[in-house]
Amino acid sequence: MRALPKIHRRGPIECERKGLLVGKCWERSQGVPVARTLVEVARLAGVSRSTVSRVINDDPNVGAETRQRVWEAVRASGYQPHAVARSLVTKRTHIIGVVIPELVTALFTDPFFPILLRSATESCNEHRYQLMLSLFSSSADRQEMYERLVGNAYLDGVMVASAALDDPLIPDLLRDGVPFVCVGRHPDPRVRSVDVDNTGGARMAVDYLIRLGHRRIGALTGRLDTAHGQDRLDGYRQALTTHGIPFSEDLIVEGDFTEGSGMTGVQRLLPADPSAVFVASDTMAVGALRALRQGGVEVPRDIALVGFDDIPVASTIEPPLTTVRQPIGRLATLAVETLLDLIEHPGSGPRRMVLPTQLVIRESC
């Protein structure tokens, strides 16, 4: 197959100076025109206009060789398919939304979300989809977002991250038949979700502390109105039960996955005299370490800590944090792939996928 030579592009102003029609500007450099319409791409690829349209709109009946030839012409010429016109044909916008029911500050204080978004964006790019981010922290913001993006069919589908178990967004999406996937378990059996083994990971972490000789183990939980907050607490309880250690309410403090709640939470736990603490997120564990250091409590000499997530700071903080690693990047990729499958095959049944976790042993216990 003949390779398409490299081209040089000029901007609209330069085209106007040369008396060329802006919007249908053909230039030649090494014999290759810059295409601005389907007709021009068709001439460059040596096919009909309708064939170019079918390729751009992902018609499966176009042969592989022709499809490759057309996309080479599109890339070489710099042609940009018109998204609105394309959506009228395909009934799709090729945009999916990532909805995070959190304040904007969560993106800058909890590394989980940037890692998730980066991997989701990369996966969307691979499938020629765009990703739109929406954050809200109140019912009014949620309703405005829903009407503006989902209600007007602006999005082909939605990925919901870190939703509370009673978040009304989920029933709304189910009611309106919007393709969506949850990052994290949801109790409604109709909901597709991708998750990690939060219960098993927490159980593994607490079991490790018990095998080190700890019996009085505190738990600094995440938000207990979320599935992962509940599941990690369940794993903690299961480990205690397995080893015959009684569950004690005075060793449980609820946090909200923020560094600040880690600081205040561990301070509330100290009067109960734990020898070790399971912290349900690394971000909270960073706050706990800071509070303990300020109070003159040494880790792990005076108290042992284990976290959950294995975000980058876990390996660089002093002391390096023993933690449960969850594959955040893979979680995001699987969520996008699951959502796109649901968009392409609306009748496919809901299912839950769970990724394994791994205990990473460092120096905090």
What are these regions (language model features)?
Residues 4, 8, 268-365:
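Flexible loop/turn connectors
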Residues 215-217, 247-251, 299-304:
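Short acidic capping loops at alpha-helix termini that bridge into adjacent secondary structure
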Residues 2-95, 365:
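N-terminal helix-turn-helix DNA-binding module of bacterial transcription factors
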Residues 32, 79-145:
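Amphipathic helical "hinge" segments at domain boundaries
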Residues 51, 91-106, 208, 216-222:
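Short beta-strand segments enriched in small/hydrophobic residues
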